[in-house]
């Protein structure tokens, strides 16, 4: 599991973050996304979400997959470093569509758009080299959250405007001074490079991609189905900061191991992958619970074709948490409310902090 990969444990909470899509008052200007010319003989874009089998952030990968597939405006593939199951962090497992090497053989001209989620190993040389190669073939690169580390190491941000998760921002600014780092925008567009803040910024950024490819009416239709009013880049990062009280809550939850529990999320064929990802991500960030999918089937397919691999086992005492029938983007609000009721408002606060999600509606 993801928590075991990071030492000391407090680094875990900042490895990946997200940004909320709630209404805010902070104004931010943004250029529209302009899709590069399609590769020869294509009638619509070929979009790739690259994944490291050893650890790729859950919402960073699943949300763009669900939004783009549901829009029906592009061909989309999840491309992994090697064959086999992709472990998502902090929860879920999926099967990719193909591998980087197989993709290169089948599509030597490259992808039109490459989406880069945050990954456990943000120094993975194979992933970085592959991103660099795709960028050299005129692919648009879209980094989600701390996928920015991989994109930056591939040289994608050199001389360009970019952003990332609030906690990583200052370190990335020091590490990659050739980029122009931008605060207080959920996503930043600079030519054929797009970057976002935290994990949930994948929703507005994905909708902006849908608008660029399929038009505003299509994006509005998809947004309505998600329960989202818009996809503005406006964002106020000021509330997202570490405080002594929050540090104590992380430590207290982590150290109270006798109170840790497993949360089982029932899933059936045709499930909504966005709703599942948001629920699993939230429940697995409390430092008191871990979300698992435990079903008899060897694999389960979402309504948009994502193949989920259930976790092989769970404790007999695992609590079952039904995902409510709400618009997918509202599932996070529901999860935070349930977390507050179960563990207290301070725990729901640190979950929202990790997700860089604004609870001010």
State the predicted function of each range.
Residues 26-141, 149-153, 183, 207-361:
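Extended, subdomain-level signal for the structured scaffold at the beginning of enzyme domains
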Residues 154-155, 191-212:
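Short alpha-helices
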Residues 1-6:
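N-terminal secretory signal peptides that target proteins for export/translocation
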Residues 53, 161, 191, 195-198, ...:
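Glycine- and other small-residue-rich loops at beta-strand/loop junctions that grip anionic moieties
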Residues 9-21:
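Bacterial N-terminal signal peptides
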Residues 158-184:
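A conserved active-site-flanking secondary-structure segment within enzyme catalytic domains
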């Amino acid at each position: 599991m993801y928590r075991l990969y990071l030492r000391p444990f407090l680094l875990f909470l900042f490895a990946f973050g997200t940004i909320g899509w709630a209404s805010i008052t902070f104004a931010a200007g943004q250029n529209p996304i302009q899709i590069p010319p399609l590769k020869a003989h294509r009638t619509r874009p070929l979009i790739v979400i690259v994944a490291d089998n050893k650890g790729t952030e859950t919402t960073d990968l699943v949300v763009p997959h669900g939004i783009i597939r549901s829009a029906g405006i592009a061909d989309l593939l999840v491309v992994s470093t090697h064959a086999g199951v992709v472990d998502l962090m902090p929860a879920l497992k999926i099967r990719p569509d193909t591998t980087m090497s197989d993709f290169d053989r089948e599509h030597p001209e490259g992808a039109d758009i490459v989406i880069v989620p945050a990954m456990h190993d943000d120094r993975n040389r194979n992933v970085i080299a592959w991103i660099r190669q795709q960028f050299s073939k005129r692919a648009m690169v879209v980094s989600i959250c701390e996928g920015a580390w991989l994109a930056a190491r591939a040289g994608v941000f050199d001389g360009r405007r970019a952003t990332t998760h609030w906690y990583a921002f200052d370190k990335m600014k020091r590490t990659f001074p050739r980029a122009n780092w931008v605060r207080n925008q959920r996503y930043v567009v600079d030519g054929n490079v797009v970057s976002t803040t935290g994990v949930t910024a994948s929703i507005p950024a994905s909708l902006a991609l849908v608008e660029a490819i399929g038009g505003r009416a299509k994006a509005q239709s998809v947004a309505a189905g998600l329960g989202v009013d818009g996809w503005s880049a406006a964002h106020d990062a000021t509330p997202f900061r570490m405080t002594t009280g929050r540090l104590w809550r992380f430590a207290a939850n982590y150290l109270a191991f006798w109170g840790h529990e497993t949360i089982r999320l029932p899933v059936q064929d045709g499930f909504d992958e966005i709703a599942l990802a948001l629920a699993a991500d939230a429940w697995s960030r409390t430092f008191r619970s871990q979300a698992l999918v435990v079903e008899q089937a060897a694999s389960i397919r979402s309504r948009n074709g994502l193949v989920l691999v259930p976790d092989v086992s769970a404790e007999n005492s695992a609590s079952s948490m039904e995902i409510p029938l709400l618009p997918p983007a509202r599932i996070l609000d529901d999860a935070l409310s349930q977390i507050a009721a179960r563990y207290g408002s301070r725990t729901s606060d640190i979950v929202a902090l990790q997700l860089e999600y604004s609870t001010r509606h």
